[in-house]
Amino acid sequence: MALQWVWLCLRKSLRNNKLMMCRILIELLKILLDVLDSGDYADGPSDNPGTGIAKEEIVKCIDFLKMLEAGDDDIDKYGFPELLAAHFANCLAVCLKAARESDAMFCCSLEANSSDFN
């Protein structure tokens, strides 16, 4: 539900600026690829069975967005909007999971450090 809200806010604020929306989505998908490449969420070099994220499909989405950003008039032939939305949601989910884990590790570290002072 929260991911849908983020997506709706982005769409609403960027509706008239498709170029900016493309750039934001490209960067988010690149972040997802970087996270997958780091091995934190991927079992292998291409797919992560736990999340169903296929890196090759993400690269195709990035290429699609670059064509859209460049003003390709015949974008309907690619048929990627649903795939793109799915990967965008996956990207946000992975980023939020990483943020929660980082926050939890930081809090545990703070608790450990504060107990050293007591």
Swiss-Prot record:
This is Bovine agnoprotein. It comes from Bovine polyomavirus.
